[in-house]
From Swiss-Prot:
GO cellular component: cytoplasm
Top-level enzyme category: ligase
NCBIfam families: PRK01117.1 (NF002223), purA (TIGR00184)
PROSITE patterns found in the cross-reference section: ADENYLOSUCCIN_SYN_1, ADENYLOSUCCIN_SYN_2
Principal location: cytoplasm
Amino acids binding GTP: 13-19, 41-43, 306, 332-334, 415-417
Regions that span the bilayer: none
Function: Plays an important role in the de novo pathway of purine nucleotide biosynthesis. Catalyzes the first committed step in the biosynthesis of AMP from IMP.
EC code: 6.3.4.4
Cofactor details (free text): Binds 1 Mg(2+) ion per subunit.
Cofactor(s) needed by this chain: Mg(2+)
InterPro entries: Adenylosuccin_syn_GTP-bd (IPR018220), Adenylosuccin_syn_Lys_AS (IPR033128), Adenylosuccinate_synth_dom1 (IPR042109), Adenylosuccinate_synth_dom2 (IPR042110), Adenylosuccinate_synth_dom3 (IPR042111), Adenylosuccinate_synthetase (IPR001114), P-loop_NTPase (IPR027417)
Protein's name according to its UniProt entry: Adenylosuccinate synthetase
Length: 431
């Protein structure tokens, strides 16, 4: 029987999920996105050729894989078309490989307009969203006024629903945020123009995945963002608007949770964060500059510079608990090459002097703690491109083993470079 594997980020996103999903899809028949939208940025490097995907699952470059956008994903038709056209220009037969749930909420121009207006109004209290309308689209879904992909297939009803929801949002844009309204006729025309094309790719995702499971076909679920950005379990309110954790797989795809076999947590050998929000182990020093420069830490979606810091084992321990992580993939180990010492945060010191090994409830709690570090020797040798554990310097192996001890979870895969083949798979999630 085939295994059903979840790949998700355990930090604040940007852990290197895209590369690992692409690598593992060699053994998968289906790759499923189950949450988020085109705020994700998954970078694949194959034989030096770089591809950045925001909405389409990372298995799209494999000719043996069907890629599915599940109901938990908020879908911007214009962003999807841009990505499809980019791939088609490179000779990828997207229509043969991509399938979409009719239940995906739509992101429309007024969602992006609201997102941008809100961030501007917040001033120095901005959340740091991508401005792509993700949050407002999820709000409409929860408020039961959102439009979904399937609504496009009844033009008259879609027009009626769109008029109602746009009247509401345009009032907010013009009267509260004092910005221009979004044009209804243009929004309607642009959306309906893609209706037939999108309909040709729509399927009953729950039925499809359940049949695949019964047939023993391996399925890979691809998470976006990271655990610490989860709407419920992250550094609230500096979070995304979806459940980025393993529990989101079932709700965002319609796949039964009892049938998930393995959860692979992707974790950098250090930590980064994009945008605003608390970050206990952030390094505002030369070491931070080293990590940011050597790790090419710029967001794949926004281009924003990422904030680097040491690995936070306290936060990673919570990620293990929330996600039932079976094993980790440690990425960007090579970025630590050349450092005299490396540190791991093993506790949080609170203002009253007490030390805890659990994460606070929300952002305010994170902002009050000071990291307690364990220091280990660094290594001068290069780990870049290593494909066998024996090729690593002993100090790097010791660092890996210490992480495993602290998290009580094995590191099953180690990434030592951006390319597909710069990876050592110690234990395959599908085996």
């Amino acid at each position: 029987m085939g295994k059903n594997v979840v790949v998700l980020g355990t930090q604040w996103g940007d852990e290197g999920k895209g590369k690992i999903v692409d690598l593992l899809t060699e053994q998968a028949k289906y790759v499923v996105r189950y949450q988020g939208g085109h705020n994700a940025g998954h970078t694949l490097v194959i034989n030096g050729d770089k591809t950045v995907l925001h909405l389409i699952p990372s298995g799209i470059l494999r000719d043996n894989v069907k890629c599915i956008i599940g109901n938990g994903v908020v879908l911007a038709p214009d962003a999807l078309m841009k990505e499809i056209n980019m791939l088609k220009e490179r000779g990828i037969p997207v229509e043969e490989r991509l399938l979409i749930s009719e239940a995906c909420p739509l992101i429309l121009p007024f969602h992006s307009a609201l997102d941008i207006a809100r961030e501007k109004a917040r001033g120095n209290k901005a959340i740091g969203t991508t401005g792509r309308g993700i949050g407002p689209a999820y709000e409409d879904k929860i408020s039961r006024r959102g439009l979904r992909v399937g609504d496009l297939f009844n033009a008259e009803l879609f027009a009626e629903k769109l008029k109602e929801v746009m009247a509401y949002h345009n009032f907010m844009l013009t009267e509260y945020y004092k910005v221009d309204a979004v044009d209804y006729e243009q929004t309607l025309s642009d959306a309906l123009a893609l209706a037939d094309y999108l309909k040709s790719m729509c399927v009953d995702v729950t039925e499809l995945l359940d049949n695949a499971r019964k047939a023993g076909e391996p399925i890979l679920f691809e998470g976006a963002q990271g655990t610490l950005l989860d709407i419920d379990h992250g550094t609230y309110p500096f979070v995304t608007s979806s459940n980025t954790t393993a529990g989101g797989v079932a709700t965002g795809s319609g796949f039964g949770p009892r049938h998930l076999d393995y959860v692979l947590g992707i974790m950098k050998a250090y930590t980064t964060r994009v945008g605003a929000g608390p970050f206990p182990t952030e390094l505002l020093c030369e070491v931070g500059d080293h990590l940011g420069t050597k790790g090419h830490e710029f967001g794949a979606t926004t281009g924003r510079k990422r904030r680097p810091g040491w690995l936070d084992a306290v936060a990673m321990r919570r990620a293990v608990q929330i996600n039932s992580v079976s094993g980790f993939c440690l990425t960007k180990l090579d970025v630590l090459d050349g450092l005299k010492e490396v540190k791991i945060c093993v506790g949080y010191q609170h203002p009253d002097g007490t030390i805890s090994k659990v994460t606070p409830l929300a952002a305010e709690g994170y902002e009050q703690v000071t990291p307690v570090y364990e220091t280990m020797p660094g290594w001068s040798e290069s780990t870049f491109g290593a494909t066998f554990l024996e090729q690593l310097p002993q100090a790097a192996i010791n660092y890996i083993k210490r992480i495993e001890e602290l998290l009580e979870t094995p590191i099953d895969i180690i990434s030592t470079g951006p390319d597909r083949n710069e990876t050592m798979i110690l234990v395959s999630p599908f085996n």
